[in-house]
Amino acid sequence: MSIQHFRVALIPFFAAFCLPVFAHPETLVKVKDAEDQLGARVGYIELDLNSGKILESFRPEERFPMMSTFKVLLCGAVLSRVDAGQEQLGRRIHYSQNDLVEYSPVTEKHLTDGMTVRELCSAAITMSDNTAANLLLTTIGGPKELTAFLHNMGDHVTRLDSWEPELNEAIPNDERDTTMPAAMATTLRKLLTGELLTLASRQQLIDWMEADKVAGPLLRSALPAGWFIADKSGAGERGSRGIIAALGPDGKPSRIVVIYTTGSQATMDERNRQIAEIGASLIKHW
């Protein structure tokens, strides 16, 4: 099914954390194996997209660095402002060389003409462009305002305190710029299926995530033909890696999956491989 024909239905939000955890032992064994292989903590949660029921979880209420996965939440906040008539996706933002930070593959090419809010969200999610994220953060009032937006959604766990690239420092036992797998999964589900955003904005957000171009080595590498995925990855210091995704067979998403890891000395390739293997186990035991 083409994404143009897929529309996320309005689904009432249920308190997922009041429900028991039904784990598929094989996938959780793989998650624990990934911890051993990486020498790191791994957090994992899988939610049913329609009901919000927790299907699997491992360390669901431990804090992990958000890294670039926050960019989906950021663009959700931007879209909320668009829906409220406080922002326009077509508004062009101009910036200078001084605004550029490391890893800005899209924004560095548009110093002369600037970029629209829509283009900045696309760059932030599909290419993980850091300057795009900072420019968008400025439009909503900075990291604290994103945290306030999340609090208003009912997420009192997830917090953004810093700008790119400092938010990726992943300092142990530092709650700044962190989330928990359970909180992130619930918040992502609200953004994609709840009434916080209009149908058009929900569709726009999932379109950007579906067009992600930098998450290929992770869950996408384990995806069978015909499956749908819309995702956003993140990478940080101290061996941190993460991904948030909506995925499912038959060309449409049916589950939310969140995976975070931190504290590893493994290479990026090895971190990617372990997450991909978790994805392969998830799909095998779907």
Curated annotation (Swiss-Prot):
Substrate binds at residues 232-234. GO terms for molecular function: beta-lactamase activity. SUPFAM superfamilies: beta-lactamase/transpeptidase-like. It comes from the Bacteria. Keywords: Antibiotic resistance, Disulfide bond, Hydrolase, Plasmid, Signal. It is an enzyme of class 3 (hydrolase). Its EC number is 3.5.2.6. One of its GO terms (biological process) is beta-lactam antibiotic catabolic process. Disulfide bonds join 75-121. Residues 1-23 form the signal peptide. It catalyses: a beta-lactam + H2O = a substituted beta-amino acid. The active site is at residues 68, 166. Pfam families: Beta-lactamase2. PANTHER family: BETA-LACTAMASE (PTHR35333), BETA-LACTAMASE-TYPE TRANSPEPTIDASE FOLD CONTAINING PROTEIN (PTHR35333:SF3). The class A beta-lactamase family has a specific amino-acid numbering system, sometimes called Ambler or ABL numbering and often misspelt as Amber. A multiple sequence alignment was used to derive a consensus sequence and then the consensus was numbered taking into account insertions and deletions. This allows use of identical numbers, e.g. for active site residues, despite differences in protein length. UniProt always uses natural numbering of residues, hence there appear to be differences in numbering between this entry and some papers. Belongs to the class-A beta-lactamase family. TEM-type are the most prevalent beta-lactamases in enterobacteria; they hydrolyze the beta-lactam bond in susceptible beta-lactam antibiotics, thus conferring resistance to penicillins and cephalosporins such as ceftazidime. This is Beta-lactamase TEM-12. It comes from Klebsiella oxytoca. The lineage of its organism: Bacteria, Pseudomonadati, Pseudomonadota, Gammaproteobacteria, Enterobacterales.
